[in-house]
Each structure stands twice: as structure tokens, then as C-alpha cells.
From Swiss-Prot:
Name listed for the protein in its UniProt record: Uncharacterized protein ORF50
Span list, region Disordered: 53-83, 187-225, 339-395, 471-503, 525-670
Compositionally biased tracts (Low complexity): 205-225, 363-395, 471-482, 490-503, 525-634
Record keywords, A-Z: Repeat
Sequence repeats: 143-158, 171-186, 200-214, 215-233, 234-252, 253-268, 279-293, 294-309, 320-334, 335-349, 362-376, 377-391, 392-406, 407-421, 422-436, 437-452, 464-477, 478-493, 504-517, 518-531, 532-545, 546-559, 560-573, 574-587, 588-601, 602-615, 616-629
Feature: compositional bias, Polar residues: 342-362
Length: 670
């Protein structure tokens, strides 16, 4: 028995009346022959026509959308519309019995089950079911790069824990041949949040970027205001631009124009091949703040920052890296002390109410100069103060300055002041100063070592470094054991201590600045490290921060952007092992060409951890931004892994492109 459903006439008339489009045909055949039973044939034809009613099938060898062959012998009088505006599905079902099919002249007895074109004279369609289907699609479009040959890739792993949130916003870089890759693994703990925001800066003038935490504008008289929660919009690159946002924290990139304002301080050495390393501590309720300003303005600069997230609960780690050219700045700040409410800028012990301030002046202007400052741990008493200043190196070549400040005595209200005169201006000179220990009485004053009593002050000043090449300045200060002591190098084991280390930029080439401080093991400590930017070429900034083992620790590292070309910024943050840890990484854009920004954040092992990474776009050409954030391994379920790689080549800057979104990697949960 043969069943023919014929509706083509009615639908054809309605299609012609409504001026619908039929332009090309997509045809598929399904032949099913049950045994025993009738043969069932299902033919589905999708037709799209263009608006020209006089067009012939030969005028359109294939559909404009699908590229398939048209149906032969379609009436040339059918109206045609623009491809993809309308699609018509024509279905034909024929159920055949055991008797033979009536023979029609020019029509084969079987329907070929193939996609090959059919001879126009071989098929005669007697019945069709026509269904009009109009589909409107809104694809997920990633961010479009504003430059030429730019690439923006984003892969986001879905959080494996309960109530986890993973947000990623990435704007495309505005330079040519720039690549921005971000891979973020969602935390595996419960109530964990992983937020990664990468914003490009608009390249036009009078542009406005409103969202949250914009980078600082690169034009003159620009303003960047914001309070950031998760999103860091790109800042305009033109003049008189405004970027306003609302968020919890604001870490704008450094402004490149005049009268601009930024939240980044200190300069890295201005010489070539300078090195500055910073390693941050960890403790319970500790705070570690490391600021590594913009790298030198030369080419081929490298900035590396490795920050271990605190292992306690409610820990926070922030890292912002700069960019410059082939200079090296190395600052090492060990873990924080074991006391409560301690603050250290380099490394501070477990004492209470202690203050440590360490200042290392600019490096020499010659080549191959070395400045080494070592500050031992401060005393175990409370309210101690130790101040050590190491001036610039001498102007000769191959000079060495070594200053050693022993531990202060155990008396109370003692003061230790050590001054090392400037080094000679000749070559191969060496200055070594060692001050003996201060007496153990109260209210004592010593030129080198301070007693262990309370309310003692130790001040050590090293001479100015020579301007020649190959000079070395070394300062070592032992911690006092009394209370109320303040040290500029190492802070005691009491609580509520502060350690601050500031290193000025060296103006020579091949200079090295090294600051090492022992880590405090107490809680509520703060470590702050500020390094001035080097203006020379081939500078490297490396910051390594060890994770605090206490709870509620905070690690903050801020590095301003280098203005030179071919700069490299690398940030690595180890996972905090405690619960409720927070890791925040902010990287300002390098303004030079061929710059590389790499940020790697290890997962916090506790629950309720937060990982936030903000990377501004490199404003030069051939810049690469790579951000990899591992998931926290605390409470929750699932695992996320992400890897990002970016490479760019070329020169110049591209125009601004439209904003884009992102889509998750195949297989990832949204």
C-alpha cells in the first residue's frame, strides 16, 4: 500500500502569497525496508530561495548557506529572498506496499539514497509537506582583538565545589600581533570563588570604559577611579579619557601620560642587567604587601614574581607585576613572624608592637655593581625599633661595601646607631664596618648593636654606593631581643611589628640589589616590600613569596608596568594551605612592544578560598599575556586545570575592536 501526503499545493500558494524565500535545496533520504512489511521512504528537503522570481535553478548551483545542490525543476516563478533569512523544510513520506510502484515516465522506480545531484528529468515530486523554519542564532563571540593578527583565547574550568563561582572577562589587546591567553581552573573547595579579569585598554581618544577597576589611562590628564569586585575594565589609551568602576579593590595600571594617578610606588634600578628579588612571608592573620614598581624603560626587560599563598585561613595574596627591558631586580622577603598583629616589609619576627624599616638607596651608576643587604630577625620583645639605611655605592669600579650590625643588647630603652661613610671613588675599593654589641643596661645607646630591653632603637646607615662598576654593598643587622624595639631590617618575634624595605633604583648597568629577611611565624603580621623601577635596559624583576603557614594571612605584591620594549613579567603564586584564603594577582600592562606578562596562581588547599587575577593589556605590539590559575584543593568536589600560552610577533598598534565575550572550553561547565 502506498501512502502519499500531499500538501505542496496549499503550502506553495501560501508561500507565494507571503513572499517567502526559496533559494537552494538541502535534501536527505532515509530508506527503511522492514522485513516483512512495506518499504518506507522519508525525504526531507530544505529549500532556501532568493528574491529574484525570474532566476532559474541553473543560476544558483548551490545554496549560499549550506553549499548544497538545488532541487531540479523547481518552479522559476517562486520568490527568492536573501540566503539564511528563511529556510523551508519540505518533507515527503512514501509508504510502499508489496505491489510495484506505478511507473511514471522519466522517474526511476527507486529513490537514490545519496547526496549526489539528481538528474533534473529523473525525479518528479508529487507530494510534499512544507514547513517554514526561521532560525535566529546569537553565537558566543569571544573578545575581538583590536590589532592585526591578534589572538584571544580563554579556557575556563567549571568550579567543582559547592556554591563556587568562576568568572572570566578578557578584553582583546589593542596592539598588533598581540596574544592574550587565560586559563583558569575553578577552585575545588566549597564556597570558593575564582575570578579572573583581563581588560584591554581602548586605543582611541576620549574613550570611556565603565565597569570595575580600570587600569590607569595612558594619555594625559586621565582619571582612573574605581572600586573593584571582580571585573577590571580596560582603561582608555587616548587623552582626557575616563574609566570609572565600582569594586572592592582597585589596582590601576601605572599611567603613561602626564598628571595621571596610580596606586603603584617605587622604582626598580635604572641600570642594565639589574636584579631585584622579593620573597614574601606567611603567618596567621598576617599581611604581606610587596610592591615592585614599573620595570626599566629599556628593551628586553624581565620581571618574575613568585608568591606562595599563605597556608592559614582567610589569607590574601596580591601580586601586580611591571614591565621594562632586560633589567633585573631581586628582593627576597621571607615568611612573616609567629607573633600576632605583626607587620613586616621584608621579614619580621614574632615580637609585639615592633617596627622594622629597611632602606637600600639607589644602585651605582657603573656596571656590574652589587648591593647586598641582609637583615636578621628582630628581638623577641615588644615595641622595638631598628632602622638600617644603606646609601648608594661608590663611583669607582669593583667597589665593595660591607656593613654588619650585630644584635642589640637586652637592656631597655636602648638605641643603636650605625653609620658607614661613603665608599671611595676609586676602583676595587672595599669598606667593611662592624659595630660591637650594645650593653645590656637600660636607656643605653650603641653605634651598632642594641640591647634586648624595651623601647630600644637601632639605627644603621650605610654609605652611598660608588658610581663605578662592580661595586658591592652588604648590610647585615641582627634582631634585638628587647621590647618596643624597631628595626629597619629584621623585626623581632613580638606581635604588631612592622618591617619596611625600600630599594631605590640603580642608574648603572649590571647592578644587583638583594634583600633577604627571615620569615615571621606569628599571626597578624604584615610584610611590605617596595622596589623602585629600573630605567635601563635588560632589567629583571623577580618576586618570590613563600606561603604563610598561619591563618588569616595576607600577601600583597604590586608591580608597576615597565615602559620599555620586549619586557617580560612573570608572576607565580603558590596555593595557600589554609581555609578561606584569598589570592589576588594584578598585573599592569607593559607599555613597550614585544612584552610578555605571565601569571601563574597555584590553588589554595583550604575551603572558601578566593583566587582573583587581573591582567591589563600590554600596550605595545607583539605582547603576550598568559594567566594560569590553579583551583584551590579544599572542601568541595571536582578538579579544574588550566593552561594559557600567548605569543605575539610584529610591530605597531592595531585599532580598537568591538568588545567581546568568552565561552568555556569544550567540556567545561558554565
Amino acid at each position: 500500500m502506498e501512502l502519499l501526503v500531499v500538501t505542496l499545493t496549499c503550502l506553495g500558494m501560501s508561500l507565494l502569497a507571503s513572499n517567502l524565500a526559496l533559494v537552494g535545496v538541502v535534501r536527505s533520504y532515509t530508506n527503511e525496508t522492514p522485513t516483512p512489511g512495506p518499504e518506507t521512504e522519508l525525504i526531507t528537503t530544505t529549500v532556501a530561495r532568493m528574491t529574484d522570481p525570474t532566476a532559474k535553478p541553473s543560476d544558483f548551483p548551490g545554496d549560499a548557506v549550506t553549499g548544497t545542490q538545488p532541487v531540479p525543476r523547481e518552479p522559476s516563478s517562486l520568490p527568492r529572498t536573501t540566503p539564511s533569512l528563511a529556510h523551508t523544510t519540505i518533507s515527503k513520506m512514501i509508504s510502499l506496499g508489496t505491489r510495484p510502484r506505478p511507473t511514471i515516465p522519466g522517474v526511476p522506480t527507486t529513490i537514490p539514497n545519496t547526496d549526489a545531484p539528481v538528474d533534473p528529468g529523473s525525479v518528479h515530486t508529487t507530494a510534499r509537506v512544507v514547513t517554514d523554519i526561521t532560525t535566529k542564532q546569537t553565537p558566543t563571540t569571544p573578545a575581538t582583538p583590536a590589532g592585526a593578527n591578534d589572538t584571544a583565547n580563554i579556557t575556563t574550568a567549571t568550579p567543582a565545589g559547592a556554591n563556587d563561582t568562576a568568572n572570566i572577562t578578557t578584553a582583546t589587546p589593542a596592539g598588533a600581533n598581540d596574544t592574550a591567553n587565560i586559563t583558569t581552573a575553578t577552585p575545588a573547595g566549597a564556597n570558593d570563588t575564582a575570578v579572573t579579569t583581563t581588560s584591554a585598554t581602548p586605543a582611541g581618544a576620549n574613550d570611556t570604559a565603565v565597569t570595575t577597576t580600570p587600569a590607569t589611562p595612558a594619555g594625559a590628564n586621565d582619571t582612573a577611579n574605581g572600586t573593584v569586585v571582580t571585573t577590571t575594565p580596560a582603561m582608555p589609551a587616548g587623552a582626557n579619557d575616563t574609566a570609572n568602576g565600582t569594586a572592592v579593590t582597585t589596582t590601576p595600571a601605572m599611567p603613561a601620560g602626564a598628571n595621571d594617578t596610580a596606586n603603584i610606588t617605587t622604582a626598580t634600578p635604572t641600570g642594565a642587567n639589574d636584579t631585584a628579588n622579593v620573597t614574601m612571608p606567611a603567618g596567621a592573620t598576617d599581611t604581606v604587601v610587596t610592591t615592585t614598581p614599573a620595570m626599566p624603560t629599556g628593551a628586553n626587560d624581565t620581571a618574575n614574581i613568585t608568591t606562595a599563598t599563605p597556608a592559614g585561613a582567610n589569607d590574601t595574596a596580591n601580586v601586580t607585576m611591571p614591565a621594562g627591558a632586560t633589567d633585573t631586580v631581586v628582593t627576597t622577603t621571607p615568611a612573616m613572624p609567629a607573633g600576632a598583629n605583626d607587620t613586616a616589609n621584608v621579614t619580621k619576627p614574632a615580637g609585639s608592637t615592633d617596627t622594622v624599616v629597611t632602606t637600600t638607596p639607589a644602585m651605582p651608576t657603573g656596571a656590574t655593581d652589587t648591593v647586598v643587604t641582609t637583615t636578621p630577625a628582630m628581638p623577641t620583645g615588644a615595641t622595638d625599633t631598628v632602622v638600617t639605611t644603606t646609601p648608594a655605592m661608590p663611583t669607582g669600579a669593583t667597589d665593595t661595601v660591607v656593613t654588619t650590625t650585630p644584635a642589640k643588647p637586652a637592656g631597655a630603652n636602648g638605641t643603636v646607631v650605625t653609620t658607614t661613610p661613603a665608599m671611595p671613588a676609586g676602583a676595587n675599593d672595599t669598606v667593611v664596618t662592624t659595630a660591637p654589641a650594645t650593653p645590656a643596661g637600660a636607656n643605653d645607646t650603641a653605634n651598632v648593636t642594641k640591647p634586648t630591653g624595651a623601647t630600644d632603637t637601632v639605627v644603621t646607615t650605610a654609605t652611598v654606593k660608588p658610581t663605578g662598576a662592580t661595586g658591592t654593598v652588604t648590610t647585615t643587622t641582627a634582631k634585638p631581643t628587647g621590647a618596643n624595639d624597631t628595626a629597619n631590617v629584621t623585626k623581632p618575634t613580638g606581635a604588631t611589628g612592622t618591617v619596611t624595605t625600600t630599594t631605590a633604583k640603580p642608574t648603572g648597568a649590571t647592578g644587583t640589589v638583594t634583600v633577604a629577611t627571615a620569615k615571621p611565624t606569628g599571626a597578624t603580621g604584615t610584610v611590605t616590600t617596595t622596589t623602585a623601577k629600573p630605567t635601563g635596559a635588560n632589567g629583571t624583576v623577580t618576586t618570590t613569596t613563600a606561603k604563610p603557614t598561619g591563618a588569616t594571612g595576607t600577601v600583597t605584591t604590586t608591580t608597576a608596568k615597565p615602559t620599555g620594549a620586549n619586557g617580560t613579567v612573570t608572576t607565580t603564586t603558590a596555593k595557600p594551605a589554609g581555609a578561606n584564603g584569598t589570592v589576588t594577582t594584578t598585573t599592569a600592562k607593559p607599555a613597550g612592544a614585544n612584552g610578555t606578562v605571565t601569571t601563574t596562581t597555584a590553588k589554595p588547599a583550604g575551603a572558601n578560598g578566593t583566587v582573583t587575577t587581573t591582567t591589563a593589556k600590554p600596550a605595545g605590539a607583539n605582547g603576550t599575556v598568559t594567566t594560569t590559575t590553579a583551583k584551590p584543593a579544599g572542601a568541595g568536589h571536582g578538579h579544574g586545570h588550566g593552561h594559557g600560552h600567548g605569543h605575539g610577533h610584529g610591530h605597531g598598534h592595531g585599532g580598537r575592536g568591538p568588545p567581546g565575550g568568552h565561552k568555556p572550553k569544550s567540556g567545561a561547565r558554565r
